[in-house]
Amino acid sequence: MKMLQGVRAFQKLKKSCAYSTAAKELKPLPVKETVNMAYDLHLPERSVIGKMPYHSPEPIVFIHGLFGWKRFYRNDCKTLATALQTPVYAVDMRNHGDTEHAMPFDYNTLMDDLVLLLRKLDIKKVNLIGYSMGGKMSMLTALNYPELVSSACIIDNAPINQPHISPFLKVFSKSCQHVENMKIRATDKEWRSKVAVGLKRYIPNPGIRSYLLQNVSGTPPKKYRSPVIDWNDGNVHFVNPVNHLFQCVVKDASAWPVEQVAGKQFLGPVNFIRGTKSEFVNADGEKAIAEYFPYHKIQSINTTHNVLHERPQEYLRSVIDFFKTTRYVLERKRDSERVTMIAKPKPLTSSQNAAEYS
C-alpha cells in the first residue's frame, strides 16, 4: 500500500515540476502524498459564553500564501477569534513554516493535506480563509469537499489558470535564490540589512521585501529541520526549500485544475477580497468566480496583491462582517428547516408504524 502511494506521489511530482539540470543536482526532497500540517489554535481572549470549547462547531482555518507562515498572522487570527467568538486554526502548508518539506507541491496535494488535518482534528464543517495560494487551495477544497466547508473568504485569487502572473512568481523565486547564493554569514550583525539589499535587486516593493525577509533566519526553526537546508554551514537561509520550490512554483502556483472541477459548484457563501492594484482577479477571474461560486460577493481594497500587509484593518473588517452575516443567515436557515421538519414530519413506513404501536 505504501509503495503504491509512493508511486502515485512520484507520478504527480513528475507532472507538476519542470525539472532542470540544476534541479537534478539538488538533494531531493521526500515525495509524500500527504503530510501533517503544523497549526496554531487561537481561542477568543474574551468569551461571552465562558471558556470556548476546542471543538466548537464550524471553526475557521486560516491559510497563508506563497512564502507565508502562520506566525505572520498571529495577531490577525487572535482578532478574528475574539471578534467572531470562534476558534481559529492558523496552518502552515507543506514547505512552509513549521510543516514538513516534501514534494509534490501542487494544489491537489495541498488540498489533501488540509483534508487530512480536518479529519485528524475531527472537524466536521469549517469556514476557510485563504490568501493567494491559500485562496486557490481553499476554493479547490470547497469544490471537491463541499460537505466539509460551510463558507469561505478568498483573498486576492481566482479559480483560473493565470499565466499572466508567472513573471511575478519568477521574481519572487529568483530573489530568494539570489539571497541564498549571497552566502551571508549568520554571525554578521548586519545580515538582515544585507538580505534586504539582496532582495531589492529584484523586488522594488518594500512591503514584499519585508514579507520575504521574515522567512530568513540564522538558526533552524525549532519545530522542524529541513533535510535539504544546511544549517551547519554558518550562513543565513530561507526556512523554505527555495531552490526546490523554484522548479514548481512558477508553473503550479498559477495553475488551476479546470478539467477536474468542470461542472462543479460550491453552493455556500463565499466572500472574495481583491486588491485594486493586483492582477490576480481579472475579468476572466470574475466570470469563473460566478460559475463556480454562485453565492459570492467581491469586495475591492486599494492595495497590490499584498492585501493582508498593506491594509490589515480593512481586510479584517471585511472578513469579520462577512462571517457574522453568514452565521446569522445560516442559523436562520437551519432554524427554518427545523420548524419545517417539525411541522411536516416524514411519514412512517407501515413497518415503522407497527413497531411504534406494538
From Swiss-Prot:
SUPFAM superfamilies the record matches: alpha/beta-Hydrolases
Predominant location: mitochondrion
AB hydrolase-1 domain residues: 59-166
Annotated compartments: Mitochondrion
Database matches in InterPro entries: AB_hydrolase_1, AB_hydrolase_fold
Any GO CC annotation of this UniProt entry: mitochondrion
Organism whose genome encodes this protein: Eremothecium cymbalariae (strain CBS 270.75 / DBVPG 7215 / KCTC 17166 / NRRL Y-17582) (Yeast)
Active site per the UniProt annotation: 132 (charge relay system), 156 (charge relay system), 305 (charge relay system)
Catalyzed reactions per annotation: ethanol + acetyl-CoA = ethyl acetate + CoA; acetyl-CoA + H2O = acetate + CoA + H(+); ethyl acetate + H2O = ethanol + acetate + H(+)
GO molecular function term, any single one: acetyl-CoA hydrolase activity
Sorted UniProt keywords: Hydrolase, Mitochondrion, Transferase
A Pfam family recorded for this sequence: Abhydrolase_1
Role, per record: Alcohol acetyltransferase that catalyzes the synthesis of ethyl acetate from ethanol and acetyl-CoA. Can also function as a thioesterase by hydrolyzing acetyl-CoA in the absence of ethanol, as well as esterase hydrolyzing ethyl acetate.
Family: Belongs to the AB hydrolase superfamily.
EC numbers for this chain: 2.3.1.268, 3.1.2.1, 3.1.1.-
Protein name listed in UniProt: Ethanol acetyltransferase 1
